[in-house]
Amino acid sequence: MTARSISVSRNGSRSIEPLWPPVLAMLAVGGLYAALPPSLVGGAPRWLPIAIVVGLLTAIVVFHYRGDHFVHQVLGHILNGLVTAAMIFSLALLIKEVTEHNITPRRLLTSAASLWISNFLIFASWYWRLDGGGPHARARTPGHTDGAFLFPQMTLPADVKLAAGEQDWEPRFMDYLFLAFNTSTAFSPTDVPVLSRWAKFLMMIQAVISLTVLALLAGRAVNIL
């Protein structure tokens, strides 16, 4: 096994991937939501969204290092659900302001950019937490051969994987972030076929949100021209 392969503990189980990439992604989502105009957050205080995100992330990290993977996963789903609902709520308010012509071009651009970036960060977290039973379940299985997404590494012959030192390859958060980014830009996965129905459903929602945000910007640009 190469130096960059997943480490193996004394009892034979592999250590889970670092937690900081998904944590940073959720902190970015909280910051982007807090930066939205008050009219797009229902009049809530600016500190409230980031406080909720930080509070839940703190608990998630604590339970992660305690080894309580069930609570860690449940809290992760709660956090994902909250930020997803908040994003859709803000998008609905943005649509309302655009249709009523109550928003300036600059505020529309910054708000749409915040929601668009939040969209692929949030859904990257969903894919990371749900695929193959979540990060802890994936870490207990040598190699990643059964999941909702068919990553290119999963299709390599065993001898090719062994020669490349990728026999124990498993997707990390960056792989799901790349998948979510492509879904937001191309409205479909590019190099990763989708196998599970739940994944197809989530990707449809993500693509619709991304398309709605871009349609708002395009419609406003046409009106300005």
Which residues does each predicted region cover?
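N-terminal membrane topogenic signal
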Residues: R10-A25
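Structural signature of hydrophobic alpha-helical transmembrane segments
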Residues: P21, G43-L57
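Membrane-embedded alpha-helical segments in integral membrane proteins
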Residues: M26-L40, V61, A92-L93
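Short, hydrophobic transmembrane alpha-helix segments
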Residues: Y33-R46, Y65-H69
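Cytoplasmic-side transmembrane-helix entry/capping segments in multi-pass membrane proteins
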Residues: L48-P49, V71-V83
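Pore-domain transmembrane helices of cation channels
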Residues: V98-H136
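Membrane-proximal soluble regions of multi-pass membrane proteins
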Residues: G132-D191
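Pore domain of cation channels
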Residues: E170-L225
